[in-house]
Amino acid sequence: MTENVYTFSMIKPEAVQNNLTGEILSEIESNGFKIIKLRKISMSYEQAQGFYESLREMPFYEELCKYMSSGSVIAMVLEKENAVKDFRELIGATNPAEARIGTIRRKYGLSKSQNAIHGSDSDESAERECRFFDL
């Protein structure tokens, strides 16, 4: 992947279950991102553990893995210049209550863990996360 052009995103289980996928995808596209690849996935608990390996020592790790394996997610590769930075700005802070008004997490997130969407935090993470899901 070319740096600064691609990022990885994942619509989380509660947003998929609450039928917010279409609204979130529209918002992503209307902010200049092109959806290059998209796949609906049901992660096993073990897959969630692998995806969040870097958070293994955190106190919320087990709960996060249970949650992320509780339903389908939408994994996708997005394209735009400065993709990682711009997408992080679009989705907002991890905690929806602290996210800027107008961001995806502020609009659709329920809590710090059930915050509707994941976005890579670096070009390296984006590449690793895309590879993890064979995207």
Regions found by a protein language model. Give the residues of each.
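Non-catalytic terminal and connector segments of soluble metabolic enzymes
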Residues: 1-135
